[in-house]
């Protein structure tokens, strides 16, 4: 009987689905940027995990590996991801940490406007709650929508206000 090895994409499924597992990967004593928690947070939110060699990180979606980070690269993780791996679906998101519906839904924990617009409709429109008043942002384009009124359709409002967003065409 032939045994087919698990594909790299399937092998990384737990890391894709669990932010906690990605966080734990950076707890390794070999991670050279422990003194820069903002850099580490940006790597985790961009779906990278530490592979345990020098400062090499790997994307759990495309499998791309990036290394050689400088302190000034702290806020360039998303840019470097797109630059090196332009076909990766995660690198195309303005807020990759909210790429999954489940992550966006978690952001609505303190949502007080359910009587005006349902959080499930906002999540379905690709939006996450910023935690400020009724402001929601698109994980794809990064634009914010706010001042919701009863009867607003999040998908339609998103499309009307930001027609160039790729999510607006869905």
From Swiss-Prot:
Q: Which CDD domains match?
A: BIR
Output the Gene3D superfamilies linked to this UniProt entry: Inhibitor Of Apoptosis Protein (2mihbC-IAP-1), Chain A
Q: A biological process (GO) annotation for this entry?
A: regulation of cell cycle
InterPro entries noted in UniProt: BIR_rpt, IAP
- Any Pfam family from its record, for instance, is BIR
> Keywords, A to Z?
Repeat
Which spans of this chain does UniProt mark as BIR repeats?
A: 22-92, 104-169
User: Which PANTHER family does the record associate with it?
Assistant: DEATH-ASSOCIATED INHIBITOR OF APOPTOSIS 2, INHIBITOR OF APOPTOSIS
Q: What does this protein do?
A: May act as an apoptosis inhibitor.
Q: What is this protein called?
A: Putative apoptosis inhibitor ORF87
Which organism is the protein's source?
Ostreid herpesvirus 1 (isolate France)
């Amino acid at each position: 009987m032939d045994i087919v090895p698990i594909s790299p994409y399937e092998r990384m499924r737990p890391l894709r689905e669990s932010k906690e597992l990605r966080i734990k990967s950076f707890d390794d004593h070999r991670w050279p940027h422990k003194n820069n928690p903002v850099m580490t947070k940006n790597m985790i939110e961009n779906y990278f995990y530490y592979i345990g060699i020098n400062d090499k990180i790997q994307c759990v979606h495309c499998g791309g590996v990036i290394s050689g980070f400088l302190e000034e690269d702290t806020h360039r993780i998303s840019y470097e991801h797109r630059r090196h791996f332009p076909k990766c679906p995660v690198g195309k998101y303005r807020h990759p940490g909210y790429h999954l519906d489940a992550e966006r839904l978690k952001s609505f924990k303190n949502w007080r406007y359910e009587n005006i617009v349902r959080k499930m409709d906002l999540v379905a429109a690709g939006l996450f709650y910023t935690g400020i008043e009724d402001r929601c942002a698109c994980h794809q384009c990064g634009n914010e929508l706010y001042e919701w009124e009863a009867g607003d359709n999040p998908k339609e409002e998103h499309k009307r206000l930001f027609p160039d967003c790729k999510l607006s065409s869905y």
